[in-house]
Regions:
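Charged alpha-helical initiation segments
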Residues: 1-46, 175-178
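Terminal alpha-helical segments
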Residues: 1-11, 45, 126, 136-147
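Short, solvent-exposed segments of well-ordered alpha helices
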Residues: 3, 36-51, 73, 100-107, ...
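Short, hydrophobic, well-ordered secondary-structure elements
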Residues: 42-66
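A structural signal for well-ordered alpha-helices, especially hydrophobic packing surfaces
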Residues: 57-61, 113-120, 154
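Short, charged amphipathic alpha-helical segments flanked by flexible coils
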Residues: 65-95, 125-140
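Histidine-centered, metal-coordinating catalytic motifs and their short helical/loop contexts
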Residues: 102-129
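Amphipathic, Lys/Arg-enriched alpha-helical patches that create a basic surface
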Residues: 127-179
Length: 179
């Protein structure tokens, strides 16, 4: 999933355009790189990347949970969210969750994934010069933060648990099985 998400992201960013936005409080214009307003193909690629990164993070956390001697006997269902499991894994492995530079971006990734999957908040366009929320969510700045947060989670937690995380550098060969 991580490989697929990263590939979708590479295809998406190649199609990004400069999108005018403005600061709501002041009206000062600025530009973001994001999918075009009606570019369904690029928006779909961004959605696939976001979903893939979220699934990759959740899958890795579940694997880490089963690998960690302090958690593998605990029913993971007692933790209602992936973030809850991450916090507990950090705690039992002497990782200061509060100091992790990627934690807010990872939370934002899961919030975006939830809004895409469960569609509880309608996508709206507010104002004349403001970029819609989805263009802001899928901006290159935010997408790079989401991607980095997943890779950092895997590297930080995986290394602490002596897991092979070499695939985060783009070498996915270990996942292929030949008969």
């Amino acid at each position: 999933m991580l490989k697929n998400a990263n590939e979708k992201w590479q295809k998406a960013i190649a199609q990004f355009v400069s999108v005018r936005d403005s600061v709501p409080e002041t009206g000062v214009d600025f530009y973001i790189n994001a999918p075009g307003m009606h570019d369904d193909n690029t928006i779909s690629l961004c959605i696939e990347a976001v979903l893939g990164w979220a699934i990759s993070a959740e899958g890795f956390v579940n694997l880490a949970w089963q690998t960690c001697p302090d958690t593998k006997q605990i029913d993971e269902k007692d933790y209602k969210s992936t973030i809850g499991k991450i916090k507990f894994l950090c705690k039992v492995n002497d990782i200061n969750y509060g100091s992790l530079s990627w934690r807010d971006s990872l939370s934002q990734l899961f919030e975006l994934r939830n809004s895409l999957v469960h569609f509880k908040v309608p996508i709206t366009y507010v104002g004349f010069s403001f970029a819609p929320k989805y263009q802001q969510d899928f901006s290159d700045t935010n997408m790079l933060k989401y991607q980095k947060s997943v890779i950092s989670l895997i590297n930080d937690l995986g290394k602490k648990l002596n897991m092979d995380v070499s695939f985060t550098s783009g070498n996915y060969e270990l996942f292929y099985y030949d008969e």
